[in-house]
């Protein structure tokens, strides 16, 4: 049930020659009827107030960047004209970092594939310069999954997927079952909402 619920909110955008993944969310307790897209900053990196086209099926809408953090790799886009056939997920962020061994689920557009739903577990944590503690998942990911929102078993937002692990010795190799996620605790949702309400 949760996988289907999540899939309905996933959007797609073709950026940087790869698919990119987005989630349509609605923080109802902050502003009724306000819809935004949560993604990775590196797939929406043209700066504040820049615009991107995001799609689901035959519907396409324009998203405006209202929050951008290169250090944490999180971006928030404001959707001015609502989608007609997509119901946004209620934004329920975790208040703490998910523990090792806990299950997760997400959907995304790896490589040139259509929407895929993937499960996994928290494997551990690493530090990222400028951002601090990151979540490492034991799951599957590939280029194009960047920006996917990770959910726990209760449907709460865990964080945003921003990278696939890599091995540099003795040669470069992508480790597609070790995935980097920035915890949602890094995002203060009041900041993008304040930008919109100015």
Q: What are the language-model segments listed below?
A:
Residues 28-35, 101, 150-157:
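A glycine-centered beta-loop-beta connector
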Residues 32-107, 112-115, 131-134, 191-197:
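Conserved active-site neighborhood of the chymotrypsin/trypsin-like protease fold
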Residues 21-22, 28, 51, 73-75, ...:
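Conserved beta-strand and immediately adjacent loop positions that scaffold enzyme active sites
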Residues 1-17, 80-88, 114-197:
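Active-site region of chymotrypsin-like
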Residues 20, 59-60, 157:
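Short, solvent-exposed loop/turn motifs
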Residues 22, 92-96, 140, 146:
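Short, conserved secondary-structure segments in the cores of folded domains
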Residues 1-51:
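Catalytic histidine site
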Residues 24-28, 64-66, 126:
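Short amphipathic beta-strand and strand-loop transition segments with alternating hydrophobic
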């Amino acid at each position: 049930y949760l996988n289907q619920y999540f899939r309905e909110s996933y959007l797609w955008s073709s950026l940087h020659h790869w698919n990119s993944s987005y989630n349509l969310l609605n923080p109802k307790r902050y502003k009724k009827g306000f819809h935004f897209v949560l993604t990775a900053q590196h797939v929406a990196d043209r700066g504040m107030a820049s615009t991107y086209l995001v799609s689901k099926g035959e519907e396409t809408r324009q998203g405006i960047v209202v929050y951008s953090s290169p250090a944490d790799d999180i971006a928030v886009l404001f959707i001015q004209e609502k989608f007609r056939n997509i119901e946004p997920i209620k934004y329920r962020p975790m208040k703490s970092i998910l523990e090792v061994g806990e299950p997760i689920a997400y959907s995304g557009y790896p490589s040139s594939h259509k929407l895929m739903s993937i499960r996994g577990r928290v494997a551990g944590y690493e530090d990222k310069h400028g951002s601090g503690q990151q979540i490492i998942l034991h799951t599957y990911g590939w280029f194009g999954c960047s920006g996917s929102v990770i959910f726990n078993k209760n449907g709460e937002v865990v964080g945003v997927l921003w990278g696939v692990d890599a091995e540099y010795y003795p040669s470069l190799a992508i480790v597609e079952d070790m995935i980097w996620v920035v915890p949602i605790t890094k995002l203060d949702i009041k900041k993008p909402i304040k930008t919109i309400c100015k």
